[in-house]
Amino acid sequence: MQENLLEKQFLNHPLYTKIQELKALNLTCNFSLDDSVNLSTNSQAKDEILAITKELKPWRKGPFKIDDLFIDTEWQSFIKFNILKPFMNEISQKCVADIGCNNGYYMFKMLEFNPAKLIGFDPSIKYRLQFELINALAKTPIKYELLGVEDLPSYSLKFDVIFCLGVIYHRSDPVKMLKDLKAGLNKNGVVFLDTMYIEDEREIALVPNKTYSKIPNIYFVPSISALKNWCERAGFKEFEVLATKKTDENEQRKTEWIDSFSLENFLDPKDKNLTIEGYEAPKRVYIRIKI
């Protein structure tokens, strides 16, 4: 029911109509990948493309380059992607899902590794519209569902590999979320997940009061030991830490494409090791878990 409502709102959105008009031009596009997702069209529709991209702000994940238009997104998402890149051979010829896929940046980057099928899940009309704009030019076979992680158990496909990046701390029941991920896997499936974490040897989690780094919907920020316990309780048998990284102002910063504050405004101005609320500053752990 929720999917149908979102899909209806999406299809009736005025920007969807504009993107469809752009798609109808059937522009020739050269699609390439480096740190950016690059689209070269040499088209006469540059003004229309610029207008749509401006209406679709904020752009969080990226960057993207469309001809001479550079969408300098809040996050330099290639930094996260490059942490996971050594493991991307695992998606070759596999059925892959990206949960919380935002505008699809990571999925576009994954195409280089030849997945058999690539499906993104995110119940956000704005991010879906951003994806549709990019894909109207790139013309990739990526599929985007206006669904959340809770829809995985009943989804029509199971997946060999699931990416779930920057989602679990937004969930009020992280073990339930992990169970939903597990239910979406094929036999011998694998999940790549990242989360903010706290430095502590104990099996505990930070429960922020109201906000964490000025973000209101952060429920739990676990220690790595607590995260491991969550995964075991959800039924995962293998837990491997791939990397840890502190979030810095090179990776996340304010640009003209977000019209709001960013990391520099979320940290204690006197001590960048603390958030504005006095918690540990954000850092992330990347894990691989298997059933």
UniProtKB/Swiss-Prot annotation:
Record's keyword terms, sorted: Transferase, tRNA processing
SUPFAM superfamilies hit by this protein: S-adenosyl-L-methionine-dependent methyltransferases
Organism placement in taxonomy: Bacteria, Pseudomonadati, Campylobacterota, Epsilonproteobacteria, Campylobacterales
Protein name according to UniProt: tRNA U34 carboxymethyltransferase
Record bears the keyword Transmembrane helix: no
EC number: 2.5.1.-
Subunit and partners: Homotetramer.
Top EC class for this record: transferase
Record-stated family: Belongs to the class I-like SAM-binding methyltransferase superfamily. CmoB family.
Cited function: Catalyzes carboxymethyl transfer from carboxy-S-adenosyl-L-methionine (Cx-SAM) to 5-hydroxyuridine (ho5U) to form 5-carboxymethoxyuridine (cmo5U) at position 34 in tRNAs.
Chain coiled-coil ranges: none
Organism: Campylobacter jejuni subsp. jejuni serotype O:23/36 (strain 81-176)
Residues involved in carboxy-S-adenosyl-L-methionine binding: K61, W75, K80, G100, D122, P123, S124, V149, E150, Y169, R284
Biological process, per Gene Ontology: tRNA wobble uridine modification
CDD domains per record: AdoMet_MTases
GO MF annotations, alphabetized: transferase activity, transferring alkyl or aryl (other than methyl) groups
UniProt cross-references to HAMAP family, sorted A to Z: tRNA_carboxymethyltr_CmoB
Name of the coding gene: cmoB
InterPro entries from the UniProt entry: CmoB, Mo5U34_MeTrfas-like, SAM-dependent_MTases_sf
Record's catalysed reaction(s): carboxy-S-adenosyl-L-methionine + 5-hydroxyuridine(34) in tRNA = 5-carboxymethoxyuridine(34) in tRNA + S-adenosyl-L-homocysteine + H(+)
The keyword tRNA processing belongs to this UniProt entry's keyword annotation: yes
